[in-house]
Amino acid sequence: MRVDQTEYEEAEAYQQSLDLLRGCLSPAGFVASPVNVDNYARVWARDGVISGLAALASGDPALIAGMRQTLTTLALHQGPHGEIPSNVTVDGSEVSYGRLAGRVDALLWYVVGVCAYIRYSSDSGFKEFARVSVERVLFLAACWEYNNRGLVYTPISGNWADEYIQQGYVLSDQLLHRMALSSAGLVFNKTEWQEKATYLQQMLAVNYWPLASLSNDPLVYHPHAYRYQASEQGEIDHWLPAFSPGGYVIYFDGLAHALALLTGLGDDGQRQRAEAYVQALEQRIGSALLPAFWPVIEPGDPDWTMLQSNHLYGQIKNQPYTYHNGGLWPVLTGLHAVGLMRYGKRERARHLLAAINTANAQGSDGGQWEFSEFEHAQTHVPMGTKYLAWSAAAGVLANQAIWHGVPSWLL
């Protein structure tokens, strides 16, 4: 598969991506997709915010207005305890905070989006409108720590991987919490939020890359599991995705990897080791697109029965090499590329952008530019819902970071 692109090809893909984002605008903000299947034609917190971040990166006034409206829609439908909707119909008649479990990440993406928009626009009216909703979100997130020890606990089906089997102290959700606290502390001048973000960053660096030399560190959250992982399981090649009272899980998490880069988690050696793992995975898979999780769960594996049970619509989406079960996602790859640009890795980031653009340009029945949700990790055939706003957002965010730098309002 050809993955290099000329600047002309990058520019064409960028315009196609902007056009798709415009096509996902509604009176209520960005819908996940204009294709009305499985609730995709709704305003979703995580999809809408990521699309909105791309809007800010683009500088397009209509798209930026769409970001503001997305955040407004989410705020106006905030739940009684501070919950941010997972999704809302465009007319506001139906609001979901999650079906099988509530969505921890919806809260956190909302705060990240609110603060990015305010830092970009200096919109004082919106800042005052959003202030109370942000305070309620961060209070609720603290409640979801349960034991007041600093880490949010995510139930199964409680984040973007809603049909996967991830649960516990999930790294990607902790990183979003850190981003939310840091940016909200800056925007709303709350020293306690900034201090909590700093402490959380330190906790994450210790607890998600267990090292024998740190086994007695006071920041270790689960000493028995930590010591076992550090001493008995050998060296690891990437950030561990989650742990729970039952111990660590050790699969690769694409979103956690991307967010770890974006937030500057760890040291140079850890970043280089994790990137080496990702590049080796690319050679194995044959694509630079980042998988949601790896390795794949196969029928007969211990986790297969639980994976089969956790789905809502029709047949199981998480067949091997698809969806969250090893599927390759442009949106994760876009966040990965932005994270790489934080460290000036332009050549590698352009390689990822080419993979995103190539994936987005594919279509069925001879069509082009269908912006599919994900690709099959063996066949590289586009799969899932078409015309995904955040697949387009991936190309915009990566392109703008490569050619204009990582925006200060994001970090």
Feature locations, PLM:
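TPR repeat positional signature
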Residues: 48, 52, 107, 111-114, ...
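Extended glycan-interaction surfaces of carbohydrate-active proteins
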Residues: 2-43, 69-101, 143-168, 206-328, ...
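Inter-helical turn/loop segments and adjacent helix faces that build the functional surface
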Residues: 58, 117-129, 183-195, 265
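Hydrophobic core segments within long, regular secondary-structure runs in both alpha-
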Residues: 11-18, 22, 52, 64-75, ...
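Extended amphipathic alpha-helical segments enriched in small hydrophobics
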Residues: 170-204, 327-363
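Alpha-helical support elements that line or immediately flank enzyme active sites
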Residues: 47-77, 120, 256-267, 333-349, ...
